[in-house]
């Protein structure tokens, strides 16, 4: 007989495949769903936390562990992991220190690249690989007094000397996506920061993937005093270079009106759509609703 765990896994698989089938066969445009999940330090098989992995100074072993995690995740229907976290963190009071590779930019860069290679391999559409997501772009670990979601004071020199190097290495290693950070950077929130998401990431580094917000980070622009309402939050985030609003429901509710009013250009919308669709093609096999 099948174990309860196996039955549950099959049920999740079947629901996932049915959702994918409907998206591809019954929706207007037939665009497949991209299934993302926090595969942080293993999936079915659990490995040491990222901070512990860094202590090994064995990036080859971390690459192997991420490859196993990718295979296990893909077998369960996951296409995309929200990992690795490469936030340089130097305040032990911050509650997410354990998710990253420590206080050194170079160490974060080396292990971040190893993780990307393990997750993505040579071909992300391989049934044993998943897309990686560098997070949290950028300066999330610099929060004052170890408090989460708060203000950070980062000079341009510190940004480039300390916080940029892991992300630059990760982008050059081929990371498919990035996730914007909750914090602001010297007054400008990470999810509405044109300098980091467009001027650096897209224009300077020529990254051709997309940026996704952290969970509900776009409406958080209101709490940060940066936007008056969700509509303005959508405008600020999208125009700054944030292609995907994760669970904020600002884009789906206000994007059409913003375009109609001329506050968001169709050229920018086309570029964002192209980035997401090309990523889908690289990550999955769009002609197949079933990946398992």
Q: What are these language model-derived features?
A:
Residues 6-9, 13-285:
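Glycoside hydrolase catalytic-domain context in secreted enzymes
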Residues 2, 285-292:
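Short "domain-exit" segments at the C-terminal end of structured domains
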């Amino acid at each position: 007989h099948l174990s309860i765990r196996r039955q549950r896994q099959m049920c999740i698989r079947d629901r996932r495949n049915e959702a994918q089938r409907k998206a591809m066969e019954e929706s207007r445009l037939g665009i497949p769903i991209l299934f993302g999940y926090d595969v942080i330090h293993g999936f079915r098989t659990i490995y040491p936390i990222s901070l512990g992995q860094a202590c090994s100074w064995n990036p080859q072993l971390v690459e192997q562990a991420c490859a196993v995690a990718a295979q296990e995740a893909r077998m369960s229907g996951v296409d995309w992991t929200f990992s690795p976290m490469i936030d340089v963190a130097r305040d032990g009071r911050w509650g997410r220190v354990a998710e990253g590779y420590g206080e050194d930019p170079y160490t974060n860069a080396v292990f971040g690249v190893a993780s990307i290679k393990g997750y993505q391999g040579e071909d992300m559409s391989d049934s044993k690989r998943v897309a990686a997501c560098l997070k949290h772009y950028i300066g999330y670990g610099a929060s004052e007094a170890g408090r989460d979601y708060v203000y950070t004071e980062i000079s341009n020199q510190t940004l480039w000397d300390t916080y940029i190097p892991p992300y630059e290495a990760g982008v050059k290693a081929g990371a498919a996506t990035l996730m914007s950070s909750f914090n602001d950077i010297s007054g400008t929130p990470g999810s509405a920061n044109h300098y980091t998401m467009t001027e650096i990431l897209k224009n300077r580094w020529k990254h051709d993937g997309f940026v996704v917000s952290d969970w509900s980070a776009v409406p958080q622009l209101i709490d940060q005093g940066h936007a008056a309402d969700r509509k303005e939050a959508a405008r600020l985030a999208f125009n700054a270079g944030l292609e995907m609003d994760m669970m904020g429901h600002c884009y789906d509710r206000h994007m059409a009106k913003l375009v109609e009013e001329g506050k968001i250009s169709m050229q920018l919308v086309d570029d964002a759509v192209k980035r997401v669709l090309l990523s889908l093609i690289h990550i999955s096999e769009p002609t197949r609703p079933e990946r398992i």
